[in-house]
Amino acid sequence: MTAKDVKFGNDARVKMLAGVNVLADAVKVTLGPKGRNVILDKAFGAPTITKDGVSVAREIELEDKFENMGAQMVKEVASKANDAAGDGTTTATVLAQAIVSEGLKAVAAGMNPMDLKRGIDKAVNAVVEELKILSKPCETSKEIEQVGTISANADETVGKLIAQAMEKVGKEGVITVEDGSGLSDELDVVEGMQFDRGYLSPYFINKPEAATVELDNPFILLVDKKISNIRELLPVLEGVAKAGKPLLIIAEDVEGEALATLVVNTMRGIVKVAAVKAPGFGDRRKAMLQDIAILTAGTVISEEIGMELEKATLEDLGQAKRVVINKDNTTIIDGIGDEAQIKGRVAQIRQQIEEATSDYDKEKLQERVAKLAGGVAVIKVGAATEVEMKEKKDRVDDALHATRAAVEEGIVAGGGVALIRAATKVATTLKGDNEDQDVGIKLALRAMEAPLRQIVTNAGEEASVVASAVKNGEGNFGYNAGTEQYGDMIAMGILDPTKVTRSALQFAASIAGLMVTTECMVADLPKEEKADLTGGMGGMGGMGGMM
């Protein structure tokens, strides 16, 4: 076992704070409408330019082991905020830095770290409740556009694209972000259902340039079992060949002789077929097959209800206008299913969402609603260079997550104003159980000014003056760093999703609280390089003459 280096008390905390500051200072330059870029070196290819807090945080690794521990803890704050809300990573980092630095000062002044942490937790819980009261629902297309614009660093085109996409596919529809081919951004809306299963054999591909299978007006056979015997499929294949239409088979699996025969028939042009695995597993697969059946007016061939594949007829097959399959996804466009039945199915799944207990189940059910009720929107990001495209794609991704969060939990005034309003309200009523807890409450509430101060600093203004003016205001009154004007933040379209602000605060306080209560740090001692034993033998070369 390697020897350890152990630091205690103030020595440990000073090192930890140094690491926190290096990471947070690198991340916080990106905050706000006038935030700057950070360039990240890559082992291969061109450097990446980004304004995304979590992307910067992930790149930072410090040489000093103790400083690195502090940096990694704050990196965790950014990652957690990103996982929970998909945005707010820079805000979370700024909050964590503010709470840690204020907290460590209090510890150095002799306060009890555990009581400080309890005070911080009380303040954060009270502010989160206050944020919920301040929150208002985000419903109109204009509000969605404003949230997207703010999250994409004041890029209005991104906000507009996301608002259009949500309008087309509904708030629960599937929206993806891809690389575009031109200079401008584009929005493609795919009406239909997409699931994450690709073709079972590359020999089905009929569009080699795009490596996809495209079937026009196909029949769709839905089977809830593995197909390995071609004899079971023959009646359906003959019927489809007579009708002169292509066929898509969605089954638990197609293997062996059955798959080989389908491939041979396709290559010879006898019948145009493609096969994919059914999405999901177990009961979820059965439910998703039923969704596809309703969407395409087909029937799931299942032995559980006494149906056999050999006896299936063309009446049992679903139909759609078009099917596109690549190696990862299958998209069914314009199924001929009855509108009323589709709506009934959606209502049924929504009921299951209400009753679901686990978050995972809810998420999967939500996906099914999206696939049935909405469609698939693809935002294609255009840029002049690959470096610019990566940077822009990051911002569009952030904006997309932010708008989803806004639709989910509502919006509050942006620019750090909501935190200040909530903190001011809480400061008048919240009391701790002892003096040290009161100090914890005060320092946490003071730290909540940090995002506004940083936005103002990045805009080149005096943070204290602006923070004081905003604190003296009421309601949504705040400072628009983009135009350098004071006013009603919501009227100016500067909105933050409540979920993003809440998550940033909770994760920052959680990890900052742990760091404030740290008393000892342990790291491996650096290994000393052993001296090269051959180093002093250089003079031996002349011994050849002694023989």
Curated annotation (Swiss-Prot):
Catalytic reactions on record: ATP + H2O + a folded polypeptide = ADP + phosphate + an unfolded polypeptide
Principal place of residence: cytoplasm
Classification via SUPFAM superfamilies: GroEL apical domain-like, GroEL equatorial domain-like, GroEL-intermediate domain like
EC code: 5.6.1.7
GO CC annotations, alphabetized: cytoplasm
Gene3D superfamilies hit by this protein: GroEL, GroEL-like equatorial domain, TCP-1-like chaperonin intermediate domain
Localization per Swiss-Prot or TrEMBL: Cytoplasm
Matching Pfam families: Cpn60_TCP1
GO annotation, biological process: protein refolding
Domain of life: Bacteria
UniProt keyword DNA-binding, yes or no: no
Listed GO MF terms: ATP binding; ATP-dependent protein folding chaperone; isomerase activity; unfolded protein binding
Top-rank EC class of the record's enzyme: isomerase
UniProt keyword terms in alphabetical order: ATP-binding, Chaperone, Cytoplasm, Isomerase, Nucleotide-binding
Binding site for ATP: T30, L31, G32, P33, K51, D87, G88, T89, T90, T91, G415, D496
Function: Together with its co-chaperonin GroES, plays an essential role in assisting protein folding. The GroEL-GroES system forms a nano-cage that allows encapsulation of the non-native substrate proteins and provides a physical environment optimized to promote and accelerate protein folding.
HAMAP family membership: CH60
Quaternary assembly: Forms a cylinder of 14 subunits composed of two heptameric rings stacked back-to-back. Interacts with the co-chaperonin GroES.
Similarity annotation: Belongs to the chaperonin (HSP60) family.
PANTHER family tied to this protein: 60 KDA HEAT SHOCK PROTEIN, MITOCHONDRIAL
Protein name according to UniProt: Chaperonin GroEL
